Amino acid sequence: MDETAKARGAQQFEEYWARQMADPAFAAVYAEEAAKKELWLQLVEARQAAGLTQAEVAERLGVSQAQVSRIEKRGYDAYTLNTLRRYVQALGDDFRLEVNVIQQARPLPV
């Protein structure tokens, strides 16, 4: 494939992606999936940076290694704040929740 064809393909993809992201429903699903991936990566990378295995974290939490594996599973989204707090503290870190409001809040229907 020559460079012109590659550039044309890249431009077509960018146009396609812009159309997809213009759809609020698609953009919402994409944002949710991206947030899950980001959380998953942060948990795994934090454990690895702490030099701990899943088994060691499990021991500190008083749960099975399988439960830690489930927490670290990509796409898992049944976290509670307490689970996240305990997990991060088991790594020897402080838990901090940051909320970024991307769109203006809308009133909820009554």
Q: What residue ranges belong to the model's regions?
A:
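Short, conserved glycine- and acidic-residue-centered signature motifs
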Residues: 36, 77-80
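Short basic helix-loop element that most often maps to the first helix and adjoining turn
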Residues: 41-56
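Short loop/turn motifs enriched for small/polar and acidic residues
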Residues: 71, 100-102
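The DNA-contacting recognition helix of HTH DNA-binding domains
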Residues: 54, 65-66, 95
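Recognition helix of helix-turn-helix/homeodomain-like DNA-binding domains
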Residues: 61-77
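N-terminal flexible/basic segments that precede or flank functional cores
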Residues: 1-38, 102-110
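Residues within the alpha-helical elements of helix-turn-helix
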Residues: 49, 60, 90
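DNA major-groove recognition helix of helix-turn-helix/homeodomain DNA-binding modules
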Residues: 81-98
